[in-house]
Amino acid sequence: MSDKSESYKVITDNRQARYLYEILETFEAGIQLTGTEVKSIRAGKVNLQDGYALLRDGEIWLINAHISPYNASGQYFNHEPRRTRKLLLHRQEIRKLIGKVEQQGLTLVPLKMYLKRGWVKVSIALGKGKKLHDKRESLKRRQDQRDMQRAMKNY
C-alpha cells in the first residue's frame, strides 16, 4: 500500500502568475466547493489564469477562477463557472495576510490547484507586481542560465 500522506496530484498550474508577479511567500489553502465543482476539478477542467484572491470581512475569497460545468450532470444542478469561492486558512494565517496586503500593497495570486489526500487544495502566494523592465530582466537572466548550461555541456 502506498503512503498517501505526502503525495499530491497537481490539477492545474498558473505559470503566468510567476511571470507577472514576484512571489514572496506561499500558503496552502482549502477551498469550499460544490459536488459538481469537485468532479470537474478531478477531470482537470480548471483555469486559474485570471484568478486572484481578495480579503473581505476577515475571510479570503478566490475570484474569477474558472471551473467548467460538469458535463455528466444536468444543467439544473450544475454550478456557475466563475463564481466566488471561499478559501479556508487558519485564523493566524489570515491575520498575517491581512497585514501584508493592506500595509504593503501586495496581491494574493493562486499558483496551483492540486489534490492532497482526496481534498482539493489551492496554493496561493503573496506577490508583488513586476514592472516591464523586471520581466525583461528575468527573461534575460533565464536565457543567460540556459546559455551557460549549454556551454558547460559542450566542455
UniProtKB/Swiss-Prot annotation:
CDD domains: SmpB. It comes from the Bacteria. InterPro entries: SmpB, SsrA-bd_prot, SsrA-bd_prot_CS. GO terms for cellular component: cytosol. Keywords: Cytoplasm, RNA-binding. Pfam families: SmpB. Its main location: cytoplasm. It is found in: Cytoplasm. Required for rescue of stalled ribosomes mediated by trans-translation. Binds to transfer-messenger RNA (tmRNA), required for stable association of tmRNA with ribosomes. tmRNA and SmpB together mimic tRNA shape, replacing the anticodon stem-loop with SmpB. tmRNA is encoded by the ssrA gene; the 2 termini fold to resemble tRNA(Ala) and it encodes a 'tag peptide', a short internal open reading frame. During trans-translation Ala-aminoacylated tmRNA acts like a tRNA, entering the A-site of stalled ribosomes, displacing the stalled mRNA. Belongs to the SmpB family. This is SsrA-binding protein. The lineage of its organism: Bacteria, Bacillati, Cyanobacteriota, Cyanophyceae, Nostocales.
